[in-house]
Amino acid sequence: MFIDGKWIIREDIDVFDPYTLENIEKITALDREETKNAIEVTEKHKEIMKNLSPSKRYKILMKVAEHLSSKKDFFAKTISIDVGKPIKQSKIEVDRTLTALKLSAFYAKELRGETINSENGLIFTKKEPLGVIGAITPFNFPLNLATHKIGPAIATGNSVVLHPSSKAPIVAIYLTKIIEHVLKQMDIPRGVFNLATGNGEIVGDEISKNDNVNMVSFTGSVEVGESISKNAKMKKVTLELGGNNPMIVLKDSDIKLAAKSAVKSKFLNAGQVCISVGQVLVEEEVVETFTKYVIEETKKLILGNPLDKNTDIGPLISPESALRIENLIKQSVSEGGELLIGGNRQNSLISPAVINIDEENILSKIETFGPILPILTVKDSEEAVNIANNSKYGLQAGLFTNNINNAMKIADELEYGGIMINSSPTFRKDNMPFGGVKKSGLGREGIKYTVEEMSETKTVVIHNI
Ligand code: NAP
Protein backbone atom coordinates (compact mmCIF):
# COMPACT_ATOMS: atom_id res chain seq x y z
CA MET A 1 0.00 0.00 0.00
CA PHE A 2 3.03 2.30 0.15
CA ILE A 3 4.83 1.26 -2.98
CA ASP A 4 7.43 3.22 -4.90
CA GLY A 5 6.60 6.32 -2.91
CA LYS A 6 2.86 6.17 -3.61
CA TRP A 7 0.04 5.29 -1.27
CA ILE A 8 -2.54 2.83 -2.60
CA ILE A 9 -5.58 3.48 -0.47
CA ARG A 10 -8.55 1.12 -0.60
CA GLU A 11 -11.05 -0.15 1.92
CA ASP A 12 -10.42 -3.90 1.64
CA ILE A 13 -9.87 -5.05 5.24
CA ASP A 14 -11.69 -3.92 8.37
CA VAL A 15 -9.47 -3.28 11.38
CA PHE A 16 -11.12 -3.53 14.80
CA ASP A 17 -10.33 -2.07 18.20
CA PRO A 18 -10.10 -5.30 20.24
CA TYR A 19 -11.54 -3.60 23.32
CA THR A 20 -14.52 -1.65 21.93
CA LEU A 21 -14.86 -4.03 18.95
CA GLU A 22 -15.51 -0.94 16.82
CA ASN A 23 -14.30 -0.80 13.25
CA ILE A 24 -11.51 1.77 13.49
CA GLU A 25 -9.97 1.61 10.03
CA LYS A 26 -10.23 0.07 6.60
CA ILE A 27 -6.97 -0.78 4.89
CA THR A 28 -5.72 -1.94 1.53
CA ALA A 29 -5.18 -5.64 0.94
CA LEU A 30 -2.66 -6.20 -1.83
CA ASP A 31 -3.38 -9.07 -4.16
CA ARG A 32 -0.59 -11.36 -5.38
CA GLU A 33 0.21 -9.31 -8.50
CA GLU A 34 0.42 -6.09 -6.47
CA THR A 35 2.68 -7.85 -3.96
CA LYS A 36 4.94 -9.04 -6.77
CA ASN A 37 5.10 -5.45 -7.96
CA ALA A 38 5.97 -4.19 -4.46
CA ILE A 39 8.81 -6.73 -4.34
CA GLU A 40 10.00 -5.76 -7.82
CA VAL A 41 10.11 -2.11 -6.79
CA THR A 42 12.10 -3.04 -3.67
CA GLU A 43 14.49 -5.05 -5.83
CA LYS A 44 14.96 -2.16 -8.28
CA HIS A 45 15.99 0.07 -5.38
CA LYS A 46 18.46 -2.27 -3.71
CA GLU A 47 21.49 -0.71 -5.42
CA ILE A 48 20.47 2.70 -4.09
CA MET A 49 20.51 1.39 -0.54
CA LYS A 50 23.76 -0.48 -1.11
CA ASN A 51 25.44 2.69 -2.34
CA LEU A 52 24.20 4.93 0.46
CA SER A 53 27.08 5.92 2.71
CA PRO A 54 27.10 4.63 6.31
CA SER A 55 26.56 8.24 7.44
CA LYS A 56 23.42 8.53 5.36
CA ARG A 57 22.04 5.23 6.66
CA TYR A 58 22.84 6.45 10.16
CA LYS A 59 21.06 9.73 9.45
CA ILE A 60 17.89 8.01 8.14
CA LEU A 61 17.63 5.95 11.32
CA MET A 62 18.38 8.84 13.68
CA LYS A 63 15.85 11.05 11.93
CA VAL A 64 13.17 8.35 12.09
CA ALA A 65 13.93 8.08 15.83
CA GLU A 66 13.69 11.86 16.20
CA HIS A 67 10.26 12.02 14.55
CA LEU A 68 9.01 9.02 16.50
CA SER A 69 10.25 10.56 19.71
CA SER A 70 8.25 13.72 19.05
CA LYS A 71 5.10 11.58 18.61
CA LYS A 72 5.62 9.13 21.47
CA ASP A 73 2.21 9.57 23.04
CA PHE A 74 0.43 9.29 19.71
CA PHE A 75 2.24 6.04 18.87
CA ALA A 76 1.61 4.57 22.32
CA LYS A 77 -2.10 5.35 22.03
CA THR A 78 -2.22 3.90 18.53
CA ILE A 79 -0.62 0.65 19.74
CA SER A 80 -3.18 0.44 22.54
CA ILE A 81 -6.09 0.93 20.15
CA ASP A 82 -4.65 -1.35 17.47
CA VAL A 83 -3.58 -4.23 19.74
CA GLY A 84 -5.50 -3.67 22.99
CA LYS A 85 -2.23 -3.34 24.91
CA PRO A 86 -2.45 -1.39 28.20
CA ILE A 87 -1.15 2.14 27.63
CA LYS A 88 1.66 1.84 30.20
CA GLN A 89 2.98 -1.20 28.29
CA SER A 90 2.57 0.56 24.91
CA LYS A 91 4.72 3.43 26.19
CA ILE A 92 7.46 0.94 27.00
CA GLU A 93 7.16 -0.48 23.48
CA VAL A 94 7.70 2.99 21.98
CA ASP A 95 10.74 3.59 24.21
CA ARG A 96 12.21 0.24 23.23
CA THR A 97 11.64 1.09 19.56
CA LEU A 98 13.65 4.28 19.98
CA THR A 99 16.48 2.24 21.49
CA ALA A 100 16.30 -0.22 18.59
CA LEU A 101 16.48 2.61 16.03
CA LYS A 102 19.43 4.29 17.74
CA LEU A 103 21.29 0.99 18.12
CA SER A 104 20.69 0.31 14.42
CA ALA A 105 22.02 3.76 13.57
CA PHE A 106 25.16 2.98 15.59
CA TYR A 107 25.71 -0.24 13.64
CA ALA A 108 25.32 1.59 10.31
CA LYS A 109 28.68 3.19 11.14
CA GLU A 110 30.12 0.12 12.83
CA LEU A 111 29.92 -2.35 9.94
CA ARG A 112 33.39 -3.72 9.58
CA GLY A 113 35.32 -6.67 8.23
CA GLU A 114 38.65 -8.13 9.29
CA THR A 115 42.10 -8.80 7.92
CA ILE A 116 43.63 -12.25 7.93
CA ASN A 117 47.36 -12.80 8.09
CA SER A 118 48.62 -14.80 5.14
CA GLU A 119 51.94 -15.54 3.47
CA ASN A 120 50.19 -15.22 0.07
CA GLY A 121 49.20 -11.59 0.31
CA LEU A 122 46.48 -9.62 1.97
CA ILE A 123 43.14 -11.21 2.84
CA PHE A 124 40.38 -8.99 4.09
CA THR A 125 36.62 -9.15 4.44
CA LYS A 126 33.87 -6.62 3.86
CA LYS A 127 30.28 -6.58 5.03
CA GLU A 128 27.81 -6.23 2.19
CA PRO A 129 24.03 -6.00 2.14
CA LEU A 130 21.98 -9.02 1.03
CA GLY A 131 19.69 -6.97 -1.24
CA VAL A 132 15.97 -7.23 -0.53
CA ILE A 133 14.76 -7.98 2.98
CA GLY A 134 11.18 -9.30 3.20
CA ALA A 135 10.09 -8.46 6.75
CA ILE A 136 6.97 -10.15 8.10
CA THR A 137 5.80 -9.15 11.58
CA PRO A 138 3.15 -10.32 14.09
CA PHE A 139 0.44 -8.31 15.79
CA ASN A 140 1.65 -8.30 19.39
CA PHE A 141 4.54 -5.76 19.23
CA PRO A 142 3.65 -4.05 15.96
CA LEU A 143 6.12 -1.17 16.32
CA ASN A 144 9.11 -2.66 18.07
CA LEU A 145 9.27 -5.90 16.11
CA ALA A 146 8.93 -4.08 12.78
CA THR A 147 11.79 -1.80 13.82
CA HIS A 148 13.94 -4.78 14.83
CA LYS A 149 13.88 -5.71 11.15
CA ILE A 150 13.74 -2.32 9.40
CA GLY A 151 16.50 -0.77 11.55
CA PRO A 152 19.20 -3.40 10.90
CA ALA A 153 18.10 -3.74 7.25
CA ILE A 154 18.69 -0.04 6.64
CA ALA A 155 21.89 -0.05 8.72
CA THR A 156 23.32 -2.78 6.50
CA GLY A 157 22.21 -1.13 3.24
CA ASN A 158 19.30 -3.36 2.26
CA SER A 159 16.00 -2.31 0.72
CA VAL A 160 12.88 -3.48 2.55
CA VAL A 161 9.39 -4.73 1.88
CA LEU A 162 7.40 -4.96 5.12
CA HIS A 163 4.25 -6.98 5.71
CA PRO A 164 2.67 -6.14 9.08
CA SER A 165 -0.03 -8.38 10.52
CA SER A 166 -3.49 -7.50 9.21
CA LYS A 167 -4.72 -7.98 12.81
CA ALA A 168 -2.89 -4.78 13.86
CA PRO A 169 -1.55 -2.92 10.82
CA ILE A 170 -2.14 0.72 11.77
CA VAL A 171 1.08 1.38 13.67
CA ALA A 172 3.17 0.21 10.70
CA ILE A 173 1.28 2.63 8.47
CA TYR A 174 2.18 5.57 10.74
CA LEU A 175 5.78 4.39 10.98
CA THR A 176 5.89 4.25 7.17
CA LYS A 177 4.67 7.86 7.02
CA ILE A 178 7.67 8.86 9.15
CA ILE A 179 10.05 6.87 6.94
CA GLU A 180 8.47 8.45 3.83
CA HIS A 181 8.99 11.91 5.30
CA VAL A 182 12.62 11.25 6.24
CA LEU A 183 13.48 9.74 2.85
CA LYS A 184 11.88 12.71 1.11
CA GLN A 185 13.79 15.18 3.31
CA MET A 186 17.04 13.38 2.45
CA ASP A 187 16.15 13.15 -1.23
CA ILE A 188 16.35 9.34 -1.29
CA PRO A 189 13.95 7.48 -3.63
CA ARG A 190 11.05 6.22 -1.51
CA GLY A 191 11.04 2.82 -3.26
CA VAL A 192 13.85 1.67 -0.95
CA PHE A 193 11.12 1.03 1.62
CA ASN A 194 7.74 -0.47 0.73
CA LEU A 195 4.80 -1.38 2.90
CA ALA A 196 2.70 -4.34 1.76
CA THR A 197 -0.49 -4.56 3.80
CA GLY A 198 -3.04 -7.30 3.26
CA ASN A 199 -3.58 -10.90 4.23
CA GLY A 200 -0.53 -12.85 5.28
CA GLU A 201 -1.65 -15.89 3.30
CA ILE A 202 -1.25 -13.85 0.12
CA VAL A 203 1.23 -11.05 0.82
CA GLY A 204 3.44 -12.93 3.31
CA ASP A 205 3.27 -16.06 1.20
CA GLU A 206 4.42 -14.18 -1.90
CA ILE A 207 7.27 -12.53 0.01
CA SER A 208 8.45 -15.94 1.18
CA LYS A 209 8.30 -17.45 -2.34
CA ASN A 210 9.43 -14.58 -4.55
CA ASP A 211 12.91 -14.99 -6.06
CA ASN A 212 13.62 -11.27 -5.83
CA VAL A 213 13.61 -11.46 -2.03
CA ASN A 214 17.07 -12.28 -0.65
CA MET A 215 16.11 -12.82 2.96
CA VAL A 216 12.85 -13.39 4.81
CA SER A 217 12.97 -12.05 8.33
CA PHE A 218 9.90 -13.51 10.02
CA THR A 219 8.43 -13.20 13.49
CA GLY A 220 5.22 -15.09 14.25
CA SER A 221 3.78 -18.52 14.91
CA VAL A 222 5.50 -21.87 14.42
CA GLU A 223 2.91 -22.95 11.84
CA VAL A 224 3.49 -19.95 9.56
CA GLY A 225 7.25 -20.11 10.21
CA GLU A 226 7.34 -23.68 8.94
CA SER A 227 5.44 -22.73 5.79
CA ILE A 228 7.84 -19.82 5.18
CA SER A 229 10.81 -22.08 5.67
CA LYS A 230 9.48 -24.48 2.99
CA ASN A 231 8.63 -21.69 0.55
CA ALA A 232 11.89 -19.81 0.95
CA LYS A 233 14.01 -22.60 -0.55
CA MET A 234 17.57 -21.18 -0.88
CA LYS A 235 16.73 -17.73 0.53
CA LYS A 236 18.22 -16.74 3.84
CA VAL A 237 15.58 -17.02 6.56
CA THR A 238 15.38 -16.04 10.20
CA LEU A 239 12.42 -17.30 12.19
CA GLU A 240 11.46 -15.84 15.57
CA LEU A 241 8.63 -18.11 16.68
CA GLY A 242 6.59 -19.11 19.70
CA GLY A 243 7.26 -21.12 22.82
CA ASN A 244 6.03 -22.61 26.07
CA ASN A 245 8.62 -20.93 28.23
CA PRO A 246 9.19 -22.71 31.55
CA MET A 247 9.98 -20.87 34.76
CA ILE A 248 11.64 -23.10 37.37
CA VAL A 249 11.28 -22.11 41.04
CA LEU A 250 13.59 -23.96 43.44
CA LYS A 251 13.03 -24.08 47.19
CA ASP A 252 16.17 -22.07 47.98
CA SER A 253 14.96 -19.01 46.06
CA ASP A 254 13.11 -15.85 47.09
CA ILE A 255 9.60 -17.31 46.66
CA LYS A 256 7.73 -14.02 46.95
CA LEU A 257 9.95 -12.41 44.34
CA ALA A 258 9.46 -15.40 42.05
CA ALA A 259 5.67 -15.23 42.44
CA LYS A 260 5.60 -11.50 41.73
CA SER A 261 7.79 -11.96 38.71
CA ALA A 262 5.62 -14.81 37.35
CA VAL A 263 2.42 -12.77 37.65
CA LYS A 264 3.89 -9.54 36.31
CA SER A 265 5.34 -11.18 33.25
CA LYS A 266 2.65 -13.75 32.51
CA PHE A 267 -0.12 -11.21 32.18
CA LEU A 268 1.79 -8.60 30.13
CA ASN A 269 -0.20 -7.86 26.99
CA ALA A 270 -2.78 -10.41 28.25
CA GLY A 271 -0.22 -13.20 27.82
CA GLN A 272 0.29 -12.41 24.13
CA VAL A 273 4.07 -12.28 24.36
CA CYS A 274 6.32 -14.88 22.74
CA ILE A 275 8.47 -15.12 25.89
CA SER A 276 5.50 -15.19 28.25
CA VAL A 277 5.64 -17.76 31.07
CA GLY A 278 4.36 -21.05 29.64
CA GLN A 279 4.36 -22.96 32.91
CA VAL A 280 5.91 -22.56 36.34
CA LEU A 281 7.68 -25.67 37.62
CA VAL A 282 7.84 -25.33 41.41
CA GLU A 283 9.60 -27.59 43.93
CA GLU A 284 6.98 -29.31 46.08
CA GLU A 285 8.23 -27.93 49.43
CA VAL A 286 7.43 -24.35 48.35
CA VAL A 287 4.53 -24.77 45.94
CA GLU A 288 1.88 -23.86 48.52
CA THR A 289 3.61 -20.61 49.49
CA PHE A 290 4.35 -19.78 45.86
CA THR A 291 0.73 -20.34 44.84
CA LYS A 292 -0.56 -18.22 47.74
CA TYR A 293 1.61 -15.27 46.63
CA VAL A 294 0.62 -15.79 43.00
CA ILE A 295 -3.08 -15.59 43.86
CA GLU A 296 -2.50 -12.49 46.01
CA GLU A 297 -0.66 -10.75 43.18
CA THR A 298 -3.16 -11.83 40.53
CA LYS A 299 -6.03 -10.35 42.55
CA LYS A 300 -4.33 -6.94 42.40
CA LEU A 301 -4.42 -6.80 38.58
CA ILE A 302 -6.83 -4.41 36.91
CA LEU A 303 -8.58 -5.73 33.82
CA GLY A 304 -10.22 -3.40 31.33
CA ASN A 305 -9.80 -0.44 29.00
CA PRO A 306 -6.27 -0.38 27.54
CA LEU A 307 -6.34 3.41 27.37
CA ASP A 308 -6.84 3.70 31.14
CA LYS A 309 -3.45 4.35 32.76
CA ASN A 310 -4.26 1.96 35.64
CA THR A 311 -5.12 -1.02 33.44
CA ASP A 312 -2.80 -4.02 33.74
CA ILE A 313 -4.60 -6.41 31.38
CA GLY A 314 -6.45 -5.42 28.25
CA PRO A 315 -8.33 -7.56 25.75
CA LEU A 316 -6.97 -10.30 23.58
CA ILE A 317 -6.54 -9.39 19.94
CA SER A 318 -10.07 -10.61 19.08
CA PRO A 319 -13.14 -12.25 20.67
CA GLU A 320 -12.17 -15.43 18.77
CA SER A 321 -8.79 -15.47 20.52
CA ALA A 322 -10.50 -15.00 23.89
CA LEU A 323 -12.89 -17.83 23.07
CA ARG A 324 -9.91 -20.03 22.22
CA ILE A 325 -8.43 -19.29 25.66
CA GLU A 326 -11.77 -19.95 27.37
CA ASN A 327 -11.93 -23.33 25.63
CA LEU A 328 -8.32 -24.13 26.54
CA ILE A 329 -9.13 -23.50 30.20
CA LYS A 330 -12.14 -25.84 29.91
CA GLN A 331 -9.99 -28.50 28.26
CA SER A 332 -7.30 -28.13 30.91
CA VAL A 333 -9.87 -28.55 33.68
CA SER A 334 -11.40 -31.56 31.93
CA GLU A 335 -7.90 -33.09 31.93
CA GLY A 336 -7.61 -32.65 35.71
CA GLY A 337 -6.37 -29.04 35.91
CA GLU A 338 -7.54 -27.13 38.98
CA LEU A 339 -8.63 -23.57 38.16
CA LEU A 340 -7.67 -21.45 41.18
CA ILE A 341 -8.74 -18.01 39.97
CA GLY A 342 -9.98 -16.18 36.86
CA GLY A 343 -10.74 -17.44 33.39
CA ASN A 344 -13.99 -15.51 32.99
CA ARG A 345 -14.61 -14.15 29.50
CA GLN A 346 -16.43 -11.09 28.31
CA ASN A 347 -16.00 -10.50 24.58
CA SER A 348 -12.22 -10.17 24.13
CA LEU A 349 -11.43 -9.84 27.83
CA ILE A 350 -10.39 -12.81 29.94
CA SER A 351 -9.72 -12.40 33.64
CA PRO A 352 -6.22 -13.63 34.56
CA ALA A 353 -6.34 -17.36 35.25
CA VAL A 354 -4.12 -19.50 37.47
CA ILE A 355 -4.34 -23.28 37.10
CA ASN A 356 -2.65 -26.20 38.82
CA ILE A 357 -1.72 -28.78 36.24
CA ASP A 358 0.33 -31.94 35.75
CA GLU A 359 2.77 -32.78 32.97
CA GLU A 360 0.12 -34.49 30.82
CA ASN A 361 -2.10 -31.39 30.77
CA ILE A 362 -2.61 -29.57 27.47
CA LEU A 363 -1.25 -26.35 29.01
CA SER A 364 2.11 -28.01 29.66
CA LYS A 365 2.55 -28.73 25.97
CA ILE A 366 1.43 -25.75 23.91
CA GLU A 367 1.88 -22.02 23.55
CA THR A 368 -1.29 -20.56 25.09
CA PHE A 369 -0.75 -16.93 24.01
CA GLY A 370 -3.31 -15.81 26.57
CA PRO A 371 -3.66 -14.90 30.27
CA ILE A 372 -3.29 -18.37 31.81
CA LEU A 373 -0.60 -19.13 34.38
CA PRO A 374 -0.17 -22.91 34.83
CA ILE A 375 1.63 -24.16 37.96
CA LEU A 376 3.14 -27.63 38.00
CA THR A 377 4.62 -29.25 41.12
CA VAL A 378 7.97 -31.02 40.75
CA LYS A 379 10.02 -33.16 43.18
CA ASP A 380 13.34 -31.52 42.40
CA SER A 381 15.35 -29.56 39.89
CA GLU A 382 16.12 -32.66 37.86
CA GLU A 383 12.44 -33.32 37.24
CA ALA A 384 11.92 -29.63 36.41
CA VAL A 385 14.68 -29.71 33.80
CA ASN A 386 13.33 -32.94 32.31
CA ILE A 387 9.84 -31.48 31.94
CA ALA A 388 11.23 -28.21 30.57
CA ASN A 389 13.31 -30.05 27.98
CA ASN A 390 10.53 -32.44 27.03
CA SER A 391 9.09 -29.82 24.70
CA LYS A 392 9.07 -29.14 21.00
CA TYR A 393 9.84 -25.48 21.81
CA GLY A 394 13.00 -23.82 23.11
CA LEU A 395 12.69 -20.04 23.27
CA GLN A 396 13.52 -18.79 26.78
CA ALA A 397 13.48 -20.29 30.28
CA GLY A 398 13.51 -18.67 33.71
CA LEU A 399 15.11 -20.07 36.86
CA PHE A 400 14.82 -18.91 40.45
CA THR A 401 17.49 -20.16 42.85
CA ASN A 402 19.99 -18.67 45.26
CA ASN A 403 22.62 -21.28 44.48
CA ILE A 404 24.80 -19.95 41.69
CA ASN A 405 26.55 -23.28 41.09
CA ASN A 406 23.22 -25.03 40.65
CA ALA A 407 22.01 -22.17 38.47
CA MET A 408 24.99 -22.53 36.14
CA LYS A 409 24.51 -26.31 35.95
CA ILE A 410 20.81 -25.95 35.10
CA ALA A 411 21.53 -23.18 32.60
CA ASP A 412 23.83 -25.63 30.80
CA GLU A 413 21.20 -28.38 30.87
CA LEU A 414 18.20 -26.37 29.63
CA GLU A 415 17.64 -26.63 25.87
CA TYR A 416 16.57 -23.03 25.32
CA GLY A 417 17.85 -20.02 23.36
CA GLY A 418 18.02 -17.87 26.51
CA ILE A 419 18.16 -18.65 30.24
CA MET A 420 17.07 -15.93 32.67
CA ILE A 421 18.39 -16.53 36.19
CA ASN A 422 16.31 -15.06 39.01
CA SER A 423 13.86 -13.72 36.47
CA SER A 424 10.92 -15.05 34.54
CA PRO A 425 11.59 -16.04 30.90
CA THR A 426 9.96 -12.75 29.90
CA PHE A 427 13.11 -10.67 29.63
CA ARG A 428 14.52 -9.04 26.55
CA LYS A 429 16.92 -6.17 25.98
CA ASP A 430 17.04 -4.83 22.45
CA ASN A 431 20.80 -5.36 22.21
CA MET A 432 20.97 -8.94 23.47
CA PRO A 433 20.91 -11.97 21.16
CA PHE A 434 17.36 -13.23 21.05
CA GLY A 435 15.88 -16.34 19.50
CA GLY A 436 15.01 -19.95 20.04
CA VAL A 437 16.11 -23.51 19.41
CA LYS A 438 13.98 -26.48 18.28
CA LYS A 439 10.62 -25.24 16.89
CA SER A 440 11.03 -21.80 18.47
CA GLY A 441 13.13 -20.56 15.63
CA LEU A 442 16.16 -20.14 13.51
CA GLY A 443 18.78 -17.39 13.76
CA ARG A 444 19.07 -14.54 16.23
CA GLU A 445 17.67 -11.03 16.50
CA GLY A 446 18.86 -8.20 18.74
CA ILE A 447 20.22 -5.35 16.66
CA LYS A 448 23.90 -6.38 16.44
CA TYR A 449 22.89 -9.98 15.69
CA THR A 450 20.28 -9.01 13.08
CA VAL A 451 22.92 -6.84 11.44
CA GLU A 452 25.06 -10.01 11.15
CA GLU A 453 22.12 -11.98 9.71
CA MET A 454 21.27 -9.24 7.21
CA SER A 455 24.75 -8.84 5.79
CA GLU A 456 27.03 -11.01 3.72
CA THR A 457 30.77 -11.39 4.27
CA LYS A 458 32.76 -10.82 1.10
CA THR A 459 36.40 -11.97 1.12
CA VAL A 460 38.95 -10.08 -0.94
CA VAL A 461 42.44 -11.49 -1.46
CA ILE A 462 45.22 -9.38 -2.94
CA HIS A 463 48.02 -11.52 -4.31
CA ASN A 464 51.55 -10.48 -5.21
CA ILE A 465 51.85 -7.40 -3.07
P1 NAP B 1 1.05 -15.36 12.81
O1 NAP B 1 -0.37 -15.68 12.66
O2 NAP B 1 2.06 -16.41 12.53
O3 NAP B 1 1.33 -14.09 11.85
C1 NAP B 1 2.60 -13.51 11.77
C2 NAP B 1 2.74 -12.80 10.44
O4 NAP B 1 2.72 -13.78 9.38
C3 NAP B 1 1.60 -11.85 10.14
O5 NAP B 1 2.10 -10.73 9.46
C4 NAP B 1 0.72 -12.67 9.22
O6 NAP B 1 -0.11 -11.87 8.40
C5 NAP B 1 1.75 -13.40 8.40
N1 NAP B 1 1.27 -14.62 7.74
C6 NAP B 1 0.13 -15.33 7.97
N2 NAP B 1 0.06 -16.39 7.14
C7 NAP B 1 1.18 -16.35 6.38
C8 NAP B 1 1.70 -17.20 5.35
N3 NAP B 1 1.05 -18.30 4.94
N4 NAP B 1 2.88 -16.88 4.79
C9 NAP B 1 3.57 -15.80 5.20
N5 NAP B 1 3.13 -14.95 6.17
C10 NAP B 1 1.95 -15.22 6.75
O7 NAP B 1 1.38 -14.79 14.27
P2 NAP B 1 0.57 -13.73 15.13
O8 NAP B 1 -0.72 -14.32 15.56
O9 NAP B 1 0.56 -12.42 14.43
O10 NAP B 1 1.57 -13.59 16.37
C11 NAP B 1 1.62 -14.50 17.40
C12 NAP B 1 2.76 -15.49 17.25
O11 NAP B 1 3.99 -14.80 17.04
C13 NAP B 1 2.97 -16.29 18.52
O12 NAP B 1 3.20 -17.63 18.19
C14 NAP B 1 4.19 -15.65 19.15
O13 NAP B 1 4.92 -16.50 20.00
C15 NAP B 1 4.98 -15.28 17.94
N6 NAP B 1 5.94 -14.23 18.26
C16 NAP B 1 7.26 -14.55 18.33
C17 NAP B 1 8.19 -13.58 18.69
C18 NAP B 1 9.66 -13.89 18.77
O14 NAP B 1 10.45 -12.95 18.70
N7 NAP B 1 10.05 -15.14 18.94
C19 NAP B 1 7.75 -12.28 18.99
C20 NAP B 1 6.39 -12.01 18.90
C21 NAP B 1 5.48 -12.98 18.54
P3 NAP B 1 -1.68 -11.71 8.74
O15 NAP B 1 -1.78 -11.39 10.20
O16 NAP B 1 -2.09 -10.61 7.87
O17 NAP B 1 -2.31 -13.03 8.41
From Swiss-Prot:
Signal peptide: none annotated. This is Lactaldehyde dehydrogenase. It catalyses: (S)-lactaldehyde + NAD(+) + H2O = (S)-lactate + NADH + 2 H(+). Pathway: Cofactor biosynthesis; coenzyme F420 biosynthesis. GO terms for molecular function: lactaldehyde dehydrogenase (NAD+) activity. The keyword NAD applies. Belongs to the aldehyde dehydrogenase family. The keyword NAD applies. NAD(+) binds at residues 220-225. Keywords: NAD, Oxidoreductase. Involved in F420 biosynthesis through the oxidation of lactaldehyde to lactate. Homotetramer. Gene3D superfamilies: Aldehyde Dehydrogenase, Chain A, domain 1 (3.40.605.10), Aldehyde Dehydrogenase, Chain A, domain 2 (3.40.309.10). The active site is at 240, 274. The lineage of its organism: Archaea, Methanobacteriati, Methanobacteriota, Methanomada group, Methanococci. NCBIfam families: lactal_redase_Meth. Its EC number is 1.2.1.22.
